[in-house]
Amino acid sequence: RDLTAATIARLNAIGIGRNDRVAIVLPNGPEMAAAFIAIGAGATTAPLNPAYRADEFNFYLTDLKAKALVVQKGVATEARDVAAKLGVAVLELVPGEHAGSFTLEGGSAAQAAQPGAAEAGDIALVLHTSGTTARPKIVPLSQANICASARHIGATLALSPADACLNIMPLFHIHGLIAAVLSSLGAGGAVICTPGFD
C-alpha cells in the first residue's frame, strides 16, 4: 500500500492522474507486476511488449496518446527514443532493495487533472487487439472490470492465502496480468514473477 500511495503521489506531482494513459515497457518480473498494480491504482496502464521495434512503439505510443512511458533504468529499449521524439514523458523505474519495490524518476512538475486514487469506473488498463484482420484497436478495461475478472478467476480456481502462483506468462498481456497476478493477490496469495519461460 505504501508503494501504491507513493506511486500515485509521484504521478500526480508530474501531472498524471486518473484515466491518463501510462505506457509500461518493462521486462517480466516483480517490478513489472508491482508497477502495473501501483500505476493502475492512480492512472490507466498500457503495458507494451518490450520486444517491439521502434516503428511498433511509435504506433502504440501515438495511438494510446500516452502521457508517459515507464522504462527500467539501465535497460536499453527503443521505446525511450521514440517517446522522446513524440514528446511523451519518460519515467525511469529504479528497482528497490526488495523484489517488486521501486521508485520513479523523471517528468516535470505539473498539476494532474484528476488526482488521487482510481475509482471503480475509471479505466485501469488498455490493451490493443491483435490486429490480425484489421488495424489493432484499443480495448479499455475499467477498475471494476479487472477486479471482477480477478475475483471470478480466483473463485473458479479456489485460490486462497495459502496459494502461490508461479507466473511465466508475459505481463504485457491480459492473461499474465489478470489470471496470474491479480487473481492470486486478490485471494491473498503470493505471486512469483519470473523473467519468462525458457
PLM features per residue range, with description:
Residues E97, A109-H128, A134-R135, Q143, ...:
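Conserved pre-ATP/AMP-binding loop-to-beta segment of ANL
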Residues I14, D20, D55, K67, ...:
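Structural detector for helix-capping/boundary residues
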Residues A13-I14, A41-A117:
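Structural core segment of the AMP-binding/adenylate-forming
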Residues L26-I37, A51-D55, I168-G186:
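Conserved coil-to-alpha-helix start sites within the AMP-binding
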Residues T7-Y52:
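Conserved AMP-binding/adenylate-forming
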Residues G40-A41, C147-A164, I174-D198:
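Conserved AMP-binding/adenylation subdomain of ANL enzymes
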Residues R1-A9, A120, V139-S160, I168, ...:
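Conserved structural elements of the adenylate-forming
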